[in-house]
Amino acid sequence: MALPLVAVVGRPNVGKSSLVNRLAGVRSAIVHDEPGITRDRLYQEVEWNGRRLRVVDTGGLVFGDDSEFLPHIRQQAMAAMAEAHAVIFVVDGREGLTPADKELADWLRRQPLPVVVAVNKCESGQLGLAQAAAFWELGLGEPIPCSAVHGNGVAELLEAVLPHLPEVAQEAADEPDPIAVAIVGRPNVGKSSLLNRLVGSERAIVSPIAGTTRDAVDTLVEWEGQSYRLIDTAGIRRKSRVEYGVEFFSINRAFKAIQRSDVVLLVIDALEGVTEQDQRLAGRIEEEGRACIIVVNKWDAVENKDTHTINEYTREIRERLYFIDWAPLLFVSALTGQRTHKIFAEVNTAVAAHRKRIATSVVNEVLQDALAWQSPPANRQGKQGKIYYGTQVAERPPTFLLFVNDPDLFKENYRRYLEKHFRQNLDFTGTPIRFRWRSKSERLVGRAVQKLEGSLASR
């Protein structure tokens, strides 16, 4: 059984995202003074007094206004309500009761869900009680004064919500974390459309206007018994085109989404090809050591395709993204669904490689084979590089420590050869791998190896 879900709703700019962040103990949704910053619904996990639940943050609800995005936001909020077991209705204690609050309360009363009213921005204890008293008029039970900024009243709010939620079996609460998949790319390459295709519903706002996803949006899905957390991110632009403000925070959030992911889907527009910004983004993924799949979207829109078209595209992409040549390529159409069914299988393969642990004996067999095929070149003084021993010291990404006579003797060409040999023999498709080089004399290497093996055995 999944964790119980609580939908957080309210009109724009009452502090819903700040409250969700306070409940979850993180700053995930973008918090800014501009109304309407949260456009999609964002999920966070909360733990309180031994109980675990999820909260879903929604965009600001406004009825009677069909301007750009508001119908989409209402649709997303209603979808969140359909999943939820209870609702936290957030109002602004400083501003007091408004006609928009009353309209929302009327709508909530017609929904088949219990509602708890959270009167946010009540920083003072006594004053907060007075501010909250005005909201009894909504007829939704006792209003709970709280402050998302300072944290007061949050415990009381959770205590008011918990009785409305089903108990969850411990084994369900202890399920392993889902695979985190960040969907990144430039604005308007089809990231949200791809997410919706993978989820099977219109989950993120899809619009031809670049930049319509402002937050890193998490969606939990399951495929063949495996859970995934899909993270749709704001499109990443060049710094010179980014104004300080919400878009700045969105791009920063997208980079953080890469950091908290297991694997990244780098979405490229088939019609535009690989741009400089795609290269920079790919570099960021490699730098962070994340598994990656290159997803070439809008393949249906490429005209005059023949049997050579994919090969030509592949060659160009490999040339321009040579530093992540280990990432598999998928040519898809989020619009028609072409080849999107292959994405989860590729994700599983990449994650398995990213988490792979190779026995020390196997590492050294591969090393000896590599040395037999091609010895390290000697320097001008005739001194030749020697590799005494190797072992894997880390995963995510796989990292190997090599004991050598002098790291400076191993130039970039030979290091690339060694990585290629490891990939050919150990199958690291979809993940970067790292080599660390340590200088050791032949006399000392035996002792260092024994010490390293002991530390690895104790893990």
From Swiss-Prot:
InterPro entries: G_ENGA (IPR031166), GTP-bd (IPR006073), GTPase_Der (IPR016484), KH_dom-like (IPR032859), KH_dom-like_a/b (IPR015946), P-loop_NTPase (IPR027417), Small_GTP-bd (IPR005225). Keywords: GTP-binding, Nucleotide-binding, Repeat, Ribosome biogenesis. Gene3D superfamilies: 3.30.300.20, P-loop containing nucleotide triphosphate hydrolases (3.40.50.300). GTP 1 binds at residues 10-17, 57-61, 120-123. One of its GO terms (biological process) is ribosome biogenesis. The keyword Nucleotide-binding applies. Residues 4-169, 179-355 form the EngA-type G domain. Residues 356-441 form the KH-like domain. It holds the Pfam family KH_dom-like. GTP 2 binds at residues 185-192, 232-236, 297-300. PROSITE patterns: G_ENGA. The keyword Transferase does not apply. GO terms for molecular function: GTP binding; ribosome binding. Belongs to the TRAFAC class TrmE-Era-EngA-EngB-Septin-like GTPase superfamily. EngA (Der) GTPase family. NCBIfam families: GTPase_EngA, small_GTP. Associates with the 50S ribosomal subunit. GTPase that plays an essential role in the late steps of ribosome biogenesis. This is GTPase Der. The gene is der.
